[in-house]
């Protein structure tokens, strides 16, 4: 008798969304839903081995889930608008495409430009649509139209219109039966899951991770476009495509063994990828955690700390391999070669130009006393001996051989501009 009561109660709860929302089927639905409508079913995901692969918990501690809260992006956008006040509207529209995509896309549908500054500070003025950053229903609604072409870059992804009212397609990698389709469609207000292979393609990521920005001069004059962030094109010209290693292969690691993708009537699937979107920005994850009140961070402190630790581990194990070769001591002179192998499918570092990588080398004598160092980091984040850190108008030379502690072997992107009259 008790088993029958439990089954009856579960059935009533399961179909409650249908009873509540059934009359809305033919009404016009919003273009997007925020993540809170998704995580109700896509959290609480435990593999048979006991690993928690909850999609919502993983996502909300990522840079993707906090793209609109990112203080570096906020400051960069503000700086650009201050430098070019006459182009403020264009700056906000461009900078919101991939960092605040829901509000920007909805503005676009109304024939307006995207806004940024009206939502700052995010902890008080940010709407849920603005706070959600790169949300679930953004990526999972991008169609395969023009993917991989230049027309799709710089945030020019296409979101499919519903085939009928109340049937916005939400693309995923797995076939979904009619029962699960109905549950999702009724509980989200008209979003219907569909299997589509392009959701696992690098070309999907390329829509925002291939960025051409507008270079502006005096008075906001457009001088041309700048290939600012090119990780997808770098990947495309690497050996990774031939090895069938996509962006998702590294940045969304596959779960070992079977895993459920929903907590409601769960079905174990082979080949689920975790939504950790691990990259290189552990520093920003720590900032988001430390200043969570100011930035409106929703992920729990331990979740952010775990995500930052995962990023560090990812960098240390999968970004590069450093080995010492040809070690030679002659008299009081020590010579050695340092080999750095790029293990990524793109440049190292890549994407936004503020990133850099450098060699930190120390030599100690038999008593453990330091006798040489190059590339030491100062408390303020500057590198000892780096000419560019000491004077922004200078550049640290490219050294094939380091012979002094004030010489640094570093890698970063520099943009050199000149005025043509």
Please state what every model-predicted region is.
Residues 23-49:
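N-terminal module-boundary/linker segments of secreted carbohydrate-active enzymes
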